[in-house]
């Protein structure tokens, strides 16, 4: 009896074809998923400034923006007043603020290079008494950002006289005050914000001051 002989014919491997197809698809998917750097959207948390700040760096601007109320997010910053352009005068600051209604960021650098200031829920103006809301806060970069929010103990947010500007008060002390010449100022712990002294010393000299309208 003749032995049976079998002939094996190798058929194309479906597994290999499938794997080969999958590898090709993966390459196509990877190519399609590659991001286009030029099309990357701008970071929505970084506000747009009408001009460069002489006091705040880009990193400091970004850090501060996280502490603003939601109604301010996305609004550009407009430089309403700066001492290098408008001079050292509180009355000039008031004049530049006339007609403004939105919140304001007041930021300054003192003779020691310390950067600090305040966020006011409304424009800075002359007033017979204190005004503002609980959105108002004080801040300091020392060198890391520290923010001092409203404690709820009183409503002494902002008060503007002809010869001084005060923010936060209680027991005869002010969280931040500036004189009429915008040359000298002071900072003390106050009940409104339970803040630390914003500068290295309670009394300081102003080197540069900016007021930004955030609306």
Swiss-Prot record:
Residues 54-215 form the TLDc domain. Residues 19-34 have a biased composition (Acidic residues). GO terms for cellular component: nucleus. Residues 1-46 are annotated as: Disordered. It comes from the Eukaryota. GO terms for biological process: response to oxidative stress. It holds the Pfam family TLD. Belongs to the OXR1 family. This is TLD domain-containing protein 2.
